[in-house]
């Protein structure tokens, strides 16, 4: 499999005293933690424990009632998701969010070109093919995303993160509903991406 080269940047995430309420329900109460460097951490808890709420705050989908989140020295808890992604945080979702009417290859290079407007399309496409080779999906490059299995959809979402090159990757239930033959690829993805300098947060 191909080696996906990444910049080895110093990563620092600081979450401090986060609180989130929905009406009278206090979902997050004074949550604090930090990540330094290429750490691999797990966020484990039962349904309703607030894992998704925390993730939604980290990626800018919702705002906390109080508390702060800093990534690489920049405050991100008041930024919209696309700005958080530019700072360096990416995530997958329990329900995959591919562009179903685009091909697998287009699903990778279109978001990357949107983020890096000045990028050369040929260079980005070549990187997308390299990513698909790493995920053993190169043979599916011209298939429409809507034709993929649930496990292949998860791999495609992981590939999109590789293209966007975040410093911190949050994987929400990455093994849920995945065929055992694809689990090995996801394990390898986590190992290599973490080994090459990315911080990984696994949610289960």
What are these regions (language model features)?
Residues 67-74, 87:
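Conserved ABC transporter NBD signature motif
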